[in-house]
A protein has these predicted regions:
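Detector for a conserved hydrophobic position within an alpha-helical segment of the HATPase_c
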Residues: 93-94
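Conserved glycine-rich
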Residues: 98, 102-105
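Short helix N-cap motif at coil->helix boundaries in the Bergerat
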Residues: 61-69
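Acidic ATP/Mg2+-coordinating residue in the GHKL
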Residues: 57
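ATP-lid-like helix-loop hinge signature
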Residues: 20-49, 105-110
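Conserved polar catalytic motif of the HATPase_c/GHKL fold
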Residues: 13-21
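A residue-level detector for a conserved hydrophobic packing site
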Residues: 8-9
Length: 152
């Protein structure tokens, strides 16, 4: 499966915008206004090889009832919100066979931020033509393997 970089960029921009608005609404001092974007390759038994993108903010977090409904069409907590951003993000990620989730961050019982993360599976097939051919003894030899997969 190919990843559409424009669509993934759209998801990241939406999550970053939401994080910035959360920090703004929390009226935090400048020293606590942080947003972290991380991109980490991972491998899990459940998901296999994937890339995890995460956006973490130090805003007020999300109430449970918002987390339960935030992907619904036209659901918004913002007075001027259309309620399509997170639903669109989820559709984009799922169209790439990925998953998206949100979680509050805690310091003891207090919510100290929110983290949105999504994963996109990575499929790196190894073309047979890139392997060194076996010689008559069954050894692979000492040649150099070349990746002959076509790139767009």
């Amino acid at each position: 499966m190919r990843v559409d970089p424009i669509l993934i960029e759209q998801v990241l921009l939406n999550l970053l915008k939401n994080a910035a608005e959360a920090i703004d609404n929390a009226a935090l001092p400048p020293s606590r206004r942080h947003i972290e974007l991380r991109v980490v390759p991972k491998h899990t038994a459940e998901l296999g090889a994937n890339i995890e993108f995460s956006v973490t903010d130090m805003g007020p977090g999300l109430p449970v009832e918002v987390i339960e409904r935030m992907y619904e069409a036209f659901f918004s907590t913002k007075a001027d919100g259309l309620g399509i951003g997170l639903g669109l993000c989820r559709s984009i990620i799922e169209s790439h066979q990925g998953r998206i989730r949100a979680e509050n961050l805690y310091n003891g019982p207090s919510i100290v931020g929110c983290r949105f993360a999504f994963t996109i599976p990575v499929d790196i097939p190894r073309p047979e033509s890139s392997l060194a051919p076996l010689d008559k003894s069954g050894d692979a030899g000492t040649g150099t393997a070349h990746n002959t997969a076509a790139t767009p």
